[in-house]
């Protein structure tokens, strides 16, 4: 992302809180890959942005370190509240 372009993307399909863990967003990766510990930018539908860190990735009850294009996953986002992200927003890195 050094030149300002994003190589990885996922549109948020659902958002929910898991007690004791945090906020999870679900979707299918449309481009690239995401890894635990990676920094991401949330592009809101209203044009605003938020920054977050991937705290975990889960696919069908299996914890992953990395997920790739085409994978349907849940991403645990650190330091994000339910007001900071919604369905239709895009996660990029």
Q: What are the functions of these language-model segments?
A:
Residues 2-93:
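C-terminal effector/interaction modules appended to NTPase cores
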């Amino acid at each position: 992302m050094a030149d300002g372009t994003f190589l990885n993307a996922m549109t948020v399909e659902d958002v929910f809180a898991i007690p004791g863990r945090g906020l999870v967003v679900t979707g299918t990766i449309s481009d690239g890959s995401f890894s635990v510990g990676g920094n991401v930018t949330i592009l809101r539908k209203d044009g605003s942005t938020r920054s977050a860190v991937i705290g975990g990735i889960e696919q069908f009850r299996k914890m992953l370190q990395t997920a790739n294009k085409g994978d349907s996953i849940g991403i645990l986002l650190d330091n994000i509240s339910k007001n900071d992200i919604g369905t239709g927003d895009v996660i990029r890195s």
